[in-house]
Amino acid sequence: MPRRVLTGRVTSDKMDKTVTVLLDRRIMHPLYKKFIRRSKKYAAHDEENVCQTGDLVRIEECAPISKRKTWSVVSRNGEDLASASSSVSA
């Protein structure tokens, strides 16, 4: 089964190697046909602590890292973290 990939905005980066990502989605009310905003927060693993509050990130499902963390950050503001880490170290 493929891993799920979601896109959201970082709301907190105060933890070490962890960011909180807020995902907004719109659903239609079944009776009134009005669109309602629903949101959910995910704890995602940020290995190199590069994400900051307000960043747009893509997170990917992974094996459990801790009790709450089963997602890891794949890209930040449109660029992959693997390529960003190699350019920072060079």
Swiss-Prot record:
Gene3D superfamilies: Nucleic acid-binding proteins
Superkingdom to which the source organism belongs: Bacteria
Database matches in SUPFAM superfamilies: Nucleic acid-binding proteins
Gene Ontology terms for molecular function: rRNA binding; structural constituent of ribosome
GO biological process: translation
UniProt keyword annotation of Ribonucleoprotein present: yes
Pfam families membership: Ribosomal_S17 (PF00366)
Gene Ontology cellular component terms for the protein in this record: cytosolic small ribosomal subunit
InterPro entries: NA-bd_OB-fold, Ribosomal_uS17, Ribosomal_uS17_bact/chlr
Keywords (A to Z) from UniProt: Ribonucleoprotein, Ribosomal protein, RNA-binding, rRNA-binding
Family designation: Belongs to the universal ribosomal protein uS17 family.
Function summary: One of the primary rRNA binding proteins, it binds specifically to the 5'-end of 16S ribosomal RNA.
NCBIfam families: PRK05610.1 (NF004123), uS17_bact (TIGR03635)
Subunit structure: Part of the 30S ribosomal subunit.
Name listed for the protein in its UniProt record: Small ribosomal subunit protein uS17
Source organism per UniProt: Gluconobacter oxydans (strain 621H)
The gene coding this protein: rpsQ
